[in-house]
């Protein structure tokens, strides 16, 4: 099966360029010759059935696999012209540029304030007043400030599930990354909390490049500007979300979107 790759228009700047990317778990070939460009300050959604490789692809963007010696990536992932796969850049600095929010809310076992301040302290030396401002800024960006401002020194575990996920997003943007990766951020949330996260995603793209993995096709249609459909480790189709959902080029894409998949 060959992929239909529709690069972004020339008028849209690419933040991440993926070329001939292959990924392996030991001998298992999980990603097969992926080629795509992730547009800057847009929301790109990865959709596809379980096990298709969408989360694996997402995690190559901040080299999460580097923690596991049996995993390896080959090819090129360039951000602003630098190949992340061959770069000798410190991994922690890369992850300051490319933040990530996981499927299950993962607040640190500390106060709401320190959840936000923790990552900032790793990369910046701020005065107390500057840190206070940064914490308020991040929580405000994540639409959590009004709910959390009176309990900043209480545990993040005391927040609801939706609030915890917004706390994780606030923690991710507090270090002012350039890219924000969201791996199924709403799968464990109720519809109201999901709606809040989707509204937040729409606001974040004004300042960040956002890439979201989702099993929820309606969510992809609502939130994203571009959509990639993946199957069995291959990129089947990639393009503007409206075109992917209304008039896809590939029958495989149409079958998945219309529920005829399988």
Swiss-Prot record:
EC annotation from Swiss-Prot or TrEMBL: 7.3.2.1
Alphabetical keyword list: ATP-binding, Cell inner membrane, Cell membrane, Membrane, Nucleotide-binding, Phosphate transport, Translocase, Transport
Q: Which chemical reaction does it catalyze?
A: phosphate(out) + ATP + H2O = ADP + 2 phosphate(in) + H(+)
UniProt-annotated location(s): Cell inner membrane
Protein's membrane topology: Peripheral membrane protein
Q: Quick one: which residues bind ATP? A: 48-55
GO MF term list: ATP binding; ATP hydrolysis activity; ATPase-coupled phosphate ion transmembrane transporter activity
Stored SUPFAM superfamilies:
P-loop containing nucleoside triphosphate hydrolases (SSF52540)
Can you give the residue ranges of the ABC transporter domain? 16-257
Q: Which GO terms describe its cellular component?
A: plasma membrane
User: Could you give a single Gene Ontology term from the biological process aspect?
Assistant: phosphate ion transmembrane transport
A Pfam family matched by this chain, by name? Answer: ABC_tran
Subunit and partners:
The complex is composed of two ATP-binding proteins (PstB), two transmembrane proteins (PstC and PstA) and a solute-binding protein (PstS).
Q: Which family does it belong to?
A: Belongs to the ABC transporter superfamily. Phosphate importer (TC 3.A.1.7) family.
Function, as annotated, reads: Part of the ABC transporter complex PstSACB involved in phosphate import. Responsible for energy coupling to the transport system.
NCBIfam families attached to this UniProt entry: 3a0107s01c2
> By what name is this protein known?
Phosphate import ATP-binding protein PstB
Give the source species.
Cupriavidus metallidurans (strain ATCC 43123 / DSM 2839 / NBRC 102507 / CH34) (Ralstonia metallidurans)
Gene name as annotated: pstB
